[in-house]
Amino acid sequence: MALDYASIIEDNQTPVADYVLDSEVLRMSLGLSRDLGARSFLLLEASAGGAYAGFMDGFLDWYHGALGIRMTERESRPRDRFLYEISLPDGRTVQRSRSNLFLGDLRVGIGFRPNPGLQTVVSLTVPTSTGPVGYGRGVPSLNLLNTVGAELSPRVHYEGSVGLGFTPRNGSLASLQRELFVAATSGVRVMAWGRNSAFANLFYHSPYYHGTTLPSLDRRELSLDFGWIVQTRTGGEWRLGMTEDLEPGGPGVDLVLRVGKSF
């Protein structure tokens, strides 16, 4: 179970295209798994989300000012106003609307554990989103994810993954969409004291689009998750973390607050 709340500002301009995204985004997800045997399991993941004008712009303006950081992209936008608009090189303009709350796509899959340090999951994402156009995949998609884990020392655990995905082109941006994707993660968890641990995780995703001339859409995504984990007496975990966008360069996700619970 996880809850993410993010404040996002994107303002990309090229001589032939323009992209503005000013929004606060909510995502809640719940994942369930059931063992089929010692080395296989089924999984199900459901989610809900929302896209809002929000309330955090004033705080973020103060925060950036306190750090001496000037963000002209935020200064050019009115506070707590939603906008999601893409102007493309071919003259088309695509707009997305905000939505208070909607159901997300449903993910089902089967996993295999050949040994304690390796896991493979094959999953299908079903287009069940009830949100406005652009907030769900719109078509079924396939994913293969391989994850490895290793104890580097009694206090340090490493985990990395490589995933391949296929999503058929669809919607108003179909001619610019890529269909094959690669994602990878690499991270460590360091035991601090008692049931407390710190974690950091680097995330990579190949570009989603091509030919838009907009860096936020045509380039790869690279981000860093970091935060704190508290293990419960029953074996579950509470996670509190943040995410920092590293690439593409320029303003992106200002702040992501993430809370997760496993049982």
Predicted regions and their residues:
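Transmembrane beta-barrel architecture of outer-membrane proteins
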Residues: 23-27, 103-107, 139-143, 181-183, ...
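Sequence/structural signature of outer-membrane beta-barrel proteins
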Residues: 4-15, 51-53, 117, 125-134, ...
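Repeated loop/turn-to-beta-strand initiation elements of outer-membrane beta-barrel proteins
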Residues: 39-44, 116-120, 154-160, 194-200, ...
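Surface-exposed strand-loop-strand hairpins of Gram-negative outer-membrane beta-barrel proteins
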Residues: 1-27, 94
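Residues on the lipid-exposed face of transmembrane beta-strands in outer-membrane beta-barrel proteins
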Residues: 28-34, 44, 108-112, 122-124, ...
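Outer-membrane pore/translocation modules
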Residues: 47-179
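Transmembrane beta-barrel strands of outer-membrane/channel proteins
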Residues: 1-7, 44-48, 120-126, 160-166, ...
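Outer membrane beta-barrel transmembrane domains
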Residues: 64-94, 173-263
